[in-house]
């Protein structure tokens, strides 16, 4: 990472964060931004109680930002020792030809931009005109909301009534916080949206339907004046199926298909320096490397399906022995890894012995009992993860050479 002089940004009264999208690493925050962060990390700003975005992962914004699309996120920040919402405009810049960054610029709306009290209690949609035709014929669910009346829904088109499962009268007795799973926490977010310039902004929420079920939605919401009333128009798109597919793909990317455990790729992601700091396991942790003894013999003699049964049974045993906070990975083949946060060597050795004994008791129909050998190592000083893994691998190698079915420390 090339170091740049960002100190001139401290002259700005609006908060600015400069973030590396791929690691979600904060490169710089100006003075105004630091005041709003207190002791929070940037990731916590994006995942707080008032945080709303259209993308969970920052790299997914890159294409739209390159095409100069207007993207807004709402962060959870600290003001006067209280959490509140802050809208940010996202801009893509390059520190070098190969080093893109995303700038989060806080949009501090003047008080005079707020939506003033409307006359929406007397609102009645006219039967003719452009708005009536647009509202009635649109196939997307549309809600008209009055922020000045506690988020009262004052109108809904037929698509919205069909989507939420209410008749028009009942729908217009509800407030936006009654259909949003954030509850009243959505109110500061709604008021932030009411200040945003430049049209409607896509943000993701979870909405509750009349039958009690929930749907993931992407909403385009922004201020609008209709018949003299200052309101908010919210266009709703159901993205539940899209979210389900994204979650399935994300799970498949991070987990082993056969055992359901975390995979080697996720191990290296978690053990990146920035991730280790976030998980508070940067120093005091231990590693177990577990290998199934004579696994090739099991495959050759009893078949690969029985070998798969052994691996799945071993995976379940490791999960049952693991403590809260321990992470279990399938490393590949018949090898597994346990990452033990805040665990000294003697505790790691004790847990490894518990695993060894437990595995020896596992019974699978049509198979003799099987055993494991385990290497154990505790992270030392500034040791890299590769250096640590070499030590634990050497310990496992010695355990196998010394007769298998045993635990050895590096």
Swiss-Prot record:
Residues 3-70, 129-198 form the PAS domain. Activity is inhibited by the phosphodiesterase PdeR. Inhibition is relieved by high cellular c-di-GMP levels. The keyword Magnesium applies. Keywords: GTP-binding, Magnesium, Metal-binding, Nucleotide-binding, Repeat, Transferase. Its EC number is 2.7.7.65. The record marks 296 as: Transition state stabilizer. Binds 1 Mg(2+) ion per monomer. One of its GO terms (cellular component) is plasma membrane. It comes from the Bacteria. It is an enzyme of class 2 (transferase). It catalyses: 2 GTP = 3',3'-c-di-GMP + 2 diphosphate. Mg(2+) binds at residues 291, 334. Forms homodimers and homotetramers. Interacts with PdeR and MlrA. NCBIfam families: GGDEF, sensory_box. Part of a signaling cascade that regulates curli biosynthesis. The cascade is composed of two cyclic-di-GMP (c-di-GMP) control modules, in which c-di-GMP controlled by the DgcE/PdeH pair (module I) regulates the activity of the DgcM/PdeR pair (module II), which in turn regulates activity of the transcription factor MlrA and expression of the master biofilm regulator csgD. DgcM stimulates activity of MlrA by direct interaction, leading to the transcription of csgD. This is Diguanylate cyclase DgcM. The gene is dgcM.
């Amino acid at each position: 990472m090339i170091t740049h002089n960002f100190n001139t940004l401290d002259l700005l009264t609006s908060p600015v964060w400069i973030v590396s999208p791929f690691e979600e690493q904060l490169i710089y925050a100006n003075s105004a931004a630091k005041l709003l962060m207190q002791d929070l990390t940037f990731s916590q700003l994006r995942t707080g109680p008032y945080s709303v975005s259209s993308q969970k992962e920052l790299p997914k914004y890159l294409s739209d930002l390159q095409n100069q699309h207007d993207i807004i996120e709402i962060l959870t920040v600290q003001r006067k020792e209280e959490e509140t919402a802050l809208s940010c405009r996202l801009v893509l810049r390059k520190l070098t030809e190969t080093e893109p960054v995303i700038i989060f610029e806080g949009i501090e709306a003047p008080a005079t931009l707020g939506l003033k009290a409307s006359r929406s209690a007397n609102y009645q949609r006219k039967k003719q005109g452009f708005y009536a035709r647009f509202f009635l014929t649109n196939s997307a669910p549309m809600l008209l909301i009055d922020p000045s009346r506690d988020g009262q829904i004052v109108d809904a088109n037929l698509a919205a009534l069909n989507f939420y499962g209410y008749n028009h009268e009942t729908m217009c007795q509800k407030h936006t916080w009654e259909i949003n799973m954030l509850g009243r926490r959505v109110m500061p977010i709604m008021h932030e949206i009411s200040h945003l310039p430049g049209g409607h902004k896509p943000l993701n929420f979870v909405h509750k339907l009349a039958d009690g079920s929930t749907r993931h939605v992407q909403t385009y919401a922004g201020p609008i004046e209709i018949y003299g009333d200052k309101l908010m128009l919210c266009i709703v798109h159901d993205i539940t199926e899209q979210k389900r597919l994204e979650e399935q793909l994300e799970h498949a990317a991070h987990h082993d298909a056969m055992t359901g455990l975390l995979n080697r790729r996720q191990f290296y992601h978690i053990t990146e320096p920035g991730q280790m700091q976030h998980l508070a396991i940067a120093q005091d942790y231990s590693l177990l490397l577990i290998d199934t003894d004579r696994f090739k013999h099991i495959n050759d003699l009893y078949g690969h399906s029985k070998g798969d049964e052994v691996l799945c049974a071993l995976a379940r045993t490791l999960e049952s022995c693991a403590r809260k906070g321990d992470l279990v990975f399938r490393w590949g083949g018949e090898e597994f890894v346990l990452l033990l946060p805040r665990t000294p060597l003697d505790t790691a050795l004790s847990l490894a012995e518990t695993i060894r004994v437990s595995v020896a008791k596992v019974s699978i129909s049509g198979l003799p009992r099987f055993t494991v050998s385990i290497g154990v190592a505790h992270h030392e000083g500034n040791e890299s993860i590769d250096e640590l893994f070499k030590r634990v691998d050497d310990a496992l190698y010695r355990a196998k050479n010394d007769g298998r079915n045993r635990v050895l420390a590096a």
